Structures are given as structure tokens and as C-alpha cells.
UniProtKB/Swiss-Prot annotation:
Biological source species: Cellvibrio japonicus (strain Ueda107) (Pseudomonas fluorescens subsp. cellulosa)
Entry protein name: Small ribosomal subunit protein uS14
UniProt keyword annotation of Hydrolase present: no
Pfam family, one: Ribosomal_S14
Subunit structure: Part of the 30S ribosomal subunit. Contacts proteins S3 and S10.
The family this protein is said to belong to: Belongs to the universal ribosomal protein uS14 family.
């Protein structure tokens, strides 16, 4: 099980990214726009750099909803491979069966 502080940090990062998503999108649009002047692009880049680091969605890490484990997490289920296997063996995941060939 991951430390509670690590899980809380990830939750905080998600909230920060959500809070600044519109502002980041607006600044990135100015930077990517061909009609923007060099001065506007420079200003937008400066403002983008001044936003909090955790406002970037790439700083987020997928974690298991049960254990908080950062590796081996299946996006579709939100569970790490260990807990997904346990849930599948109990029959908690409809349509998921153990492979057999």
C-alpha cells in the first residue's frame, strides 16, 4: 500500500491540473497560433511558465484505487494487476475471465 501522503499528493495534482486547465489551454492556443506575433508568443510562454508545476497534466500518475500502487495499473479498471486479478477471481469484474488456450 502506498503512503497516504503520496495518494494525497496525486489528488492535489489532479485538482490543480483541473483548476488551471482552461488557462493552460488558452495560453497554448496563443503559442500554437500562426497569427500570433512574436511578442504575444513570448508573453504567453512566460505566463505558462509561471503557472504551478502541478498544473500540467503530464505530472499526474495513474495509481490503483485500492492500494495506491503506481505501477501495473490498468486504465480501464483503475486497479493494479494484483487487485484486478483478485477481483477477477472473485467474479467482481463482469466479462473478465482467466485466459485459457
Amino acid at each position: 500500500m502506498a503512503k497516504k501522503s503520496m495518494i494525497a499528493r496525486e489528488v492535489k495534482r489532479a485538482e490543480t491540473a483541473k483548476k488551471f486547465a482552461a488557462k493552460r489551454a488558452e495560453l497554448k492556443a496563443i503559442i500554437a497560433s500562426a497569427s500570433s506575433s512574436e511578442e504575444q508568443i513570448w508573453e504567453a510562454q512566460t505566463k505558462l511558465q509561471q503557472l504551478p508545476r502541478d498544473a500540467s497534466p503530464s505530472r499526474q500518475r495513474n495509481r490503483c484505487r485500492v492500494t495506491g500502487r503506481p505501477h501495473g495499473v490498468y486504465r480501464k479498471f483503475g486497479l493494479c494487476r494484483h487487485k484486478l486479478r483478485e477481483a477477477a477471481m472473485r467474479g467482481d469484474v463482469p466479462g473478465l475471465v482467466k485466459a485459457s488456450w
